[in-house]
Each structure stands twice: as structure tokens, then as C-alpha cells.
Amino acid sequence: MLEREIAAFVERTDTIYPANTATLSAAQQRAIYDRYAAAFTPPLPAGLHVENASFTASLGHSIGLRLYRPVAANPQRAGTVLYFHGGGFVVGSLDSHEIVTARLAADTGLCVIAVDYRLAPEHGVPAAHDDCLEVTLAALAGRLPFASLPAPLLLAGDSAGGNLAASVAMALRDRGTDGTAGLEGVRGIALIYPMLGAEPQLPARETEAHAPLLTLADVYAFRRLYWGNRWDEGHENAAVPAWTLPLHADRFDGLPATLAIGVEHDPLRDDARVFVERIQAAGGEAQAWLGEGLVHGCWRALSTSPGVQQLHATVCRFLLDTLRRPD
């Protein structure tokens, strides 16, 4: 059953974001999504300094970055969050998720950097992953175009961005085994209603296939735009680029502290739970949290929904608690 405030959020969303949006062209989807995001984005919270910059990737393209830095620095809350936005790898921008990134910075006192990675279908797999990995490596090496970013680093993201945070962490772990820069310096990862596998996990894949705001058909449409036709008949053996589907990994050990959040009415709900179970089975530290009565993309209802306010508080508490732990 939907929380009452979430039902109102869904009703308002339906007036802005047509149910068939995932079937439209990427350009049409982005125009609709940008209008939708703007309708739910409040003014910036007080006490933040915002700075835009760009990072030049190894292939020569620019990756947009936006830093939210609390004006009143608190040495007891020193750290930087790299945030990877959601949007099915197809939509989303620095602006679209400001309701999340600005509030995370304001409510934790941490620096938060939003990452404007390349989008599909113009840039298919593994472009988004590669951009986020490059930015993370640059952050760890002190090469981002911002002054005095506090360590340590945390990774976070929602939906597709949750996939990217998990895949970057796995890639860094595996790099560390061959003598290159690894996970040292990354204290934790927070995944909010993430997409972590080629197929959403059961039972939500079946019970929530027609959930509000994200259906199973939507998941498959986004999957095809980013990963291509690898799961179509006749293409089942096409290779999946390493790390881009975290639930397909061979290993779940060696990861930093992990929070994975699922929401009740979402075909992706059980991806978070299964990821946590596999990390725990491998001896790692991970916790799951379930948002009852909530839907995919509900963070935009932060101002009205008690359940979303609890979700947001859970993420903030995890980030701060993780930073307080000894190395």
C-alpha cells in the first residue's frame, strides 16, 4: 500500500511525466525529465557554497562536476561524497538531482560532488561507469578542479547511479589487487533503489512489475539503451563489460561499508537486499533498509513524505557514522 503522501506525489508526477516516457526518443525523455525534476526542485538550502567545474577525461571529453560545500566547516564532519545521479543511464544531469545533492550536503555538513557522466544511447556501456571511475580516481589522487576537498571519500547514487557507485567500488577493489590504485580512501558506499543486475531480483520483479513511476518494461527499455541487445534472442552470449552489473560479480568481498536501500513498490526493490546478502555472506559489512509504502524515485517527495524523510535520514546517518569509524 502506498503511503498517503507518496500517493499524492505519484498523482502529481503523472501530470508531468507521462507513463509512456521510456518508449520515446532519448531527447524527448530528457526534455520531459528535466521539466519534471525542475517542478520538484526547491531553492538551495542556506549555508552552501556551490561551484561548477569540469574534469577532462583520458579520452578527451569533459565531465561536468558540481560541488556543494558547507560554508561553516565542521572538523567533526570532514569528508567528501561523490554522487552519481539516477535516470536509467539515459536522463539526468547536475540540475536534475539537486534536490538530493544539495540536501545531503546541508544535512550532513559534508562536501558533495555531483558527477555529470555520459548518457546512453549516445554513449553505451561502459561509458557511464568509466566516467565515474575516472572521477573517483582523480578525487582519490587530489586531481579534481576544486580546492581542499576533505578526505575520506564516500560514493553514493540512486537507481542507475547506485549501479555506478557499486560498480566503481568493485572496479577499485580489483584494481588494488594488481598493484594499481584501489579502494584505500573510499570509506563507504550508499545505494538508493539501485539497479544492480540484468534482471531485477525476485520476488519484486514479478510482484512490482507494474509499480507506479517505474515498471519492469521501463527497466528493460533503459537496459537496452545502455547495454544494448545482449539479452535479446540470439544475443544471449554477448559479453557484459566487467563490473557494470554488480550482482553478476564473482566476488563480493573486499568492499567498503555498504548501505543499500530498496523501496516497497519498485521492480528493483530486491536488488538492494540481494546485494547486501551477498556482501554479508562474503564476510563484508553491509546493511539493507526497506522503505515501506515508497516508490522508485521517491526522494523528490522529501518535503512532504514521512517515509522519504526517514530514507533521507538513513542515508545521512550512514554517511556520518561511516566517517566516524576508525580506519
Question: Where is each model-derived feature located?
Answer:
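Active-site glycine-rich loops that stabilize anionic/oxyanionic intermediates
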Residues: 85-90, 265
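Catalytic nucleophile-loop/oxyanion-hole region of alpha/beta-hydrolase
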Residues: 93-94, 100, 113-152, 302-308
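Gly/Ala-rich beta-loop-alpha elbow adjacent to hydrolase catalytic centers
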Residues: 157, 161, 165
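Alpha/beta hydrolase fold serine-hydrolase catalytic domain that processes acyl esters and thioesters
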Residues: 151, 167-327
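Short beta-strand-to-loop junctions in surface cap/lid or active-site-entrance loops
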Residues: 65-77, 247-252
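Short beta-strand element of the alpha/beta-hydrolase
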Residues: 77-86
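A glycine/proline-hinged amphipathic helix-loop "lid/cap" segment
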Residues: 1-67, 232-236, 323-327
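Alpha/beta-hydrolase active-site loop signature
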Residues: 88, 117-121, 196, 295
